[in-house]
Swiss-Prot record:
Similarity section: Belongs to the calycin superfamily. Fatty-acid binding protein (FABP) family.
Record's GO cellular component terms: cytoplasm
Database matches in SUPFAM superfamilies: Lipocalins
Originating species: Lepidoglyphus destructor (Storage mite)
Residues noted as binding (9Z)-octadecenoate in the record, renumbered to the chain: R106, R126, P127, Y128
Function: FABPs are thought to play a role in the intracellular transport of long-chain fatty acids and their acyl-CoA esters.
Superkingdom per UniProt: Eukaryota
Key words, A-Z: Allergen, Cytoplasm, Lipid-binding, Transport
Protein name: Fatty acid-binding protein
Domain description: Forms a beta-barrel structure that accommodates hydrophobic ligands in its interior.
Keyword check for Phosphoprotein: no
Entry's Gene Ontology molecular function annotations: lipid binding
One Pfam family per UniProt: Lipocalin
Amino acid sequence: MANIAGQYKLDKSENFDQFLDKLGVGFLVKTAAKTVKPTLEVAVDGDTYIFRSLSTFKNTEIKFKLGEEFEEDRADGKRVKTVIVKDGDNKFVQTQYGDKEVKVVREFKGDEVEVTASVDGVTSVRPYKRA
């Protein structure tokens, strides 16, 4: 697998507003989330992965081992159970279980990572470029 560790800056967003609406994110949080351009920071420590989202609005971190369930706070503020698995060499598939099932796919392609998030038939695509 290629070295995915590093920082990636959001390049653009497609359908993010509709995704946040379907998720049930409140107006103020949604407005702030749409205006910032977060940096995705990826670190690997043995078999543990750390994905951080850093912005002027909010910083989040998930630390996980592939296939092991953990809890995290979803964008709408709800605490959910999450599992992340690898699909092939460069794709991480995250499934959040709660009142709604959310799927987030992070596909690493050289100096880019494409983040695709889906809930209830609505999909958002957010490409990031290595900083």
